[in-house]
Curated annotation (Swiss-Prot):
One of its GO terms (molecular function) is structural constituent of ribosome. Keywords: Ribonucleoprotein, Ribosomal protein. It holds the Pfam family Ribosomal_L27. One of its GO terms (cellular component) is ribonucleoprotein complex. Signal peptide: none annotated. Gene3D superfamilies: 2.40.50.100. The keyword Ribonucleoprotein applies. Belongs to the bacterial ribosomal protein bL27 family. The gene is rpmA. This is Large ribosomal subunit protein bL27. InterPro entries: Ribosomal_bL27 (IPR001684), Ribosomal_bL27_CS (IPR018261). Residues 1-21 are annotated as: Disordered. One of its GO terms (biological process) is translation. HAMAP family: Ribosomal_bL27 (MF_00539).
Length: 84
């Protein structure tokens, strides 16, 4: 006979790895071409002037300049790069 109870199991003992999403370059900061400005799931914020969109919806700078967030058409958020 066992002298200790069985350990049992749980269905909750795991956690996903962090994804490090969010804004990487704040509005008003200067960036170089290729710098990641924002990592996101889906296109909550769309790329504007001089900003590109990666296949995982990452927004990055296409030119050297200053980051500028604004509300675009239909009040959708956009990120522009104002060339320096």
């Amino acid at each position: 006979m066992a002298h200790k109870k069985g350990g049992g199991s749980t269905k909750n003992g795991r956690d996903s790895n962090p994804k490090y999403l969010g804004v990487k370059a704040a509005g008003g900061s200067t960036v170089n071409a290729g710098t990641i400005i924002l990592r996101q799931r889906g296109t909550a914020i769309k790329p504007g002037d001089n900003a590109g969109l990666g296949k995982d919806h990452t927004i990055f700078a296409l030119v050297d300049g200053t980051v500028h967030f604004r509300n675009g058409r239909n009040n959708k958020k956009q990120v522009d790069i104002i060339p320096s």
